[in-house]
Amino acid sequence: MAWLSADIELIKKYRKLCNQFKGGAMCGRYYVDDETAKEIEKIVRSVDEQLKKEAARDIHPTECAPVLVASGGDLRCEVKRWGMPGFMDKQLVINAKSESAMDKKMFCEAVEHRRLVIPAAGFYEWNRQKEKSTFTRKDSPVLYMAGIYSKYEDGDRFVILTTAANESMEPVHDRMPLILEKEEILPWLTEGRKTGEFLGKVPCQLNRTTEFEQLTLF
């Protein structure tokens, strides 16, 4: 597997943005933590003590976040903003359905030419009773969400691809992020002929923790 190009300036930029941005739709918030940073660091093959110490934070729409993109035959870590402007005034689009993205004017070119991966420690979802659940991988501290991005005057913006919920997600929502395995990252980014196959995949089963389960007196 090719690896991320070490780019200290991008890492510094991400650290600066993390300090700047503190902080209905499916997967409207996700989060990164020190394990996410460590995983990115492994792929980048660079050691940056400040990134290791990056405080856990939630990523909200309109904020900037680290993503993985293809760079030649390798991978690269960049910082892009979450959410694309919609066709209606002040509309923000943060997700795209994997089943129909290739047929949508807004997304089809990005699906073909500008795919990316969003690393996260987990993501949140709320049910109809407004109860919050946290979803994480069972076998890894980091999950990789498939996404696409487009270029705008104010910089690159991305959306998270979603698919039908699997058994672990169905009790809370009928949609979930399109989650990739680590070994699928490079093929998703570089092998266009496999795009349709990836868009139709069923994500792995996830751990779910409800908000009341996260509360403790100790």
Can you say where each PLM-predicted feature lies in the sequence?
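Short linear sequence motif anchored by a di-proline
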Residues: 2-218
